[in-house]
Structure formats: structure tokens, C-alpha cells
């Protein structure tokens, strides 16, 4: 029952843990397919100022990160609704309950796609979260874990919000990505 390392969203407030930054993960705005913003491909952060966002319940780091984005944008939390997981948030958006922020890796294949949700990227400096690998500073495995963390560092293209959605805001299909890769090309970005 011992944990040697973990991959977590920063900030992590524990001086006994070594943190090795892996990547910056952009957020996307997820809206129901018939929402007034659904036709948009991009928006600026301040355009969220009149929106109420669905958030996770207390205790999730993603909730804290989304609240920070809400504060920066002048948006609010949608009262009366709190999700227990990312999948619940996705289902709430698909059911037209509201809009939310989703991390890019939570919507990229192989995650199941939903035709009821449109994904909108942010123009300019997109809101994001920092992901790090952490382990005990006193760990005898520190040299190995440092090398392992280097393997977890993701290429920027993988985290590109453009590649998370097709041109119409619908999540990119796994087929399009695989077809491009099989021809030795990077998947097309829009």
C-alpha cells in the first residue's frame, strides 16, 4: 500500500514532495450543442463574464482551478448544481444543464466523444493548469522517477486545443488522427 509517485495538478503545498513540472494543460469551454456560443470556434476569456459555469463539488482541484478562471473572467458558478466527476460535468453539459470548463486531455481521444457538446477554445492566453509529477524528496527512487517524469512530458501538439476539436467545435475523431499518423503526418489542426 505505498505510493512512490503521482501525477497531479499544481499547486501542491507540501515541502516534503519534489515536484517536476510536466506540461501546461489548456482548458476548453464545453457548451450544449444548441447554446448561443455553440457556433463559436474561439472566444476571449472576458466573454465568459455573463456565464454561470457548472463546477465540480468541493475537494476537487479542478473546482479550485475553474473558480480561479471564473474570477478572472467575471463569471460565476451555477448555483444548485455540483458534479462529482468530469464525466458527470460532461453529461450535464450534454443534457443542456449549463456550460463548463474541461481540461484538454479530458476531451481528446480515446475519451468518448459526444455530439451533444461543442468545445470552444480560448483566444490569446488560454486559461490552463500546470501538471507535475511528484514524489517524496527522500525517495531512494528519485533518480529513476526524474527520468520517468521526463517520459511523461507531453509534446505541445498533443495539448494543442486546436487538435482537441474539429473546426465546428465537435471533438476531433480518433479516425482522423489515426489516418494522419498512419501516413506519417501530424493530425490536422484547425
Residue ranges and their predicted role:
Residues 82-89:
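Short helix-initiation/N-cap motifs at beta->coil->alpha
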